[in-house]
């Protein structure tokens, strides 16, 4: 076999392996209103009308990644504008994280033990109901999860903001809520979120019940906004306009 042929075979195998190893993410809007989906560090952003999907690929090793939805946005032809919830610096294609409140899907691909780590988090608050999980469930904690409770409608008065339910750290600050220095535990407010979304992260060290894993290399994922087709599984009155009154997966 010539050196050229050997190189071409090696290149083809490397390309196929890399392509196969890349995680495919589908982000689907099932809400009865427009959602401006966002994803970093891979993806950027996309406007999704009801029933539309957006696909992107995240390479192995992608970490500290987030997917979320933005509401009540207005962008010009150059992709500059503003969103009421989840805004990421006034651009359509996000380069950084969104401004709370926003319901988060978080993931890190191909980490230790050849596992993907992923979760739903309400540490940054809540704006849109969400489900997240592998397209083909596997053993153990490789199955779909959701956060679809009527959090906006039941939000405590101290956390209510237009279009969402804010998080205690942004609202009050301090170690008790932000958990930035050493160990910390749940608070009354984080328990309030946890009761409504038991699979979701409710405070930064909520790992035991909120981190999910799937085998790397072969797993694709789907994020769905409003999996029940409305605000949650009981009402269609969403998004709610309310009077005005960060955890990281495997690094």
UniProtKB/Swiss-Prot annotation:
Superkingdom of origin organism: Eukaryota
Cited SMART domains: THN
Keywords: Disulfide bond, Glycoprotein, Pathogenesis-related protein, Plant defense, Signal
Pfam families linked to this entry: Thaumatin
Span of the signal peptide: 1-21
Glycosylation sites: 233
Induction: By tobacco mosaic virus infection and wounding.
Gene Ontology terms: biological process: defense response
Disulfides per UniProt: 31-226, 73-83, 88-94, 142-214, 147-197, 155-165, 169-178, 179-184
Entry-linked PANTHER family: OS03G0233200 PROTEIN
Family: Belongs to the thaumatin family.
Protein name: Osmotin-like protein
Originating organism: Nicotiana tabacum
């Amino acid at each position: 076999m010539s050196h050229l042929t050997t190189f071409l075979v090696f290149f083809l195998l490397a390309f196929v392996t890399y392509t196969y190893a890349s995680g495919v993410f589908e982000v689907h809007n099932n809400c009865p209103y427009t959602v401006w989906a966002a994803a970093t560090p891979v993806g950027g952003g996309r406007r999704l009308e009801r029933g539309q999907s957006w696909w992107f690929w995240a390479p192995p090793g992608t970490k500290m990644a987030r997917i979320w939805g933005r509401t009540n946005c207005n962008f010009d032809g150059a992709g500059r504008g503003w969103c009421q919830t989840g805004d990421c610096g006034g651009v359509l294609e996000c380069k950084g994280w969104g401004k709370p409140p926003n319901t988060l899907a978080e993931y890190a691909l191909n980490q230790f033990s050849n596992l993907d780590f992923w979760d739903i988090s309400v540490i940054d608050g809540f704006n849109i109901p969400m489900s997240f999980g592998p397209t083909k469930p596997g053993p153990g904690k490789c199955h779909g999860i959701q956060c679809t409770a009527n959090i906006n409608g039941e939000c405590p008065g101290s956390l209510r903001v237009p279009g969402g339910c804010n998080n205690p750290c942004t609202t009050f600050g301090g170690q008790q809520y932000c958990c930035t220095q050493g160990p910390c535990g749940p608070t009354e407010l984080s328990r309030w979120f946890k009761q409504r979304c038991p699979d979701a992260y409710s405070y930064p060290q909520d790992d035991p019940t909120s981190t999910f894993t799937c085998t790397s290399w072969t797993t694709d994922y789907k994020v769905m906004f409003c999996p029940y087709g409305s605000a949650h599984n009981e009402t269609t009155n969403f998004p709610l306009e309310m009077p005005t009154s960060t955890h990281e997966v495997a690094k």
